[in-house]
Curated annotation (Swiss-Prot):
It comes from Photobacterium profundum (strain SS9). CDD domains: PoNe_Nuclease (cd20736). One of its GO terms (molecular function) is nucleic acid binding. This is UPF0102 protein PBPRA3228. Pfam families: UPF0102.
Amino acid sequence: MVSPLPLNKRQQGQVYEVMAEQYLQRHHLKPVERNFTCRSGEIDLIMRDKSCVVFVEVKFRKQNHFGSAAEAVNWRKQQKLKRAALLWLKKNSLSTEHTEFRFDVVAIQGPDQQIEWFTNTLVEG
């Protein structure tokens, strides 16, 4: 019997994005888009929470020796997410003045894949 090949980082990321999307759907968010990519970066998931557009960064850490999964979303990553989100809004003819939106992080941690959901996480400045 042949054992399955190990997943590369991209494939692993897709597995965790699906887990995060399903988790958010169980909490009544609706999927809009996955893996929006532009020059500024990538947004893992774009969801809707009623009338609010939610830009979601999904992070996984097997161990927390170098910080938790949530801590991996540093200021630089947040700025990339913000630029990508503003471009997505523009591409979808949505204005920042008339569209409610926020940035969430879904952190998947450890061998038991514990999920934590942090809402409205963007640090201004």
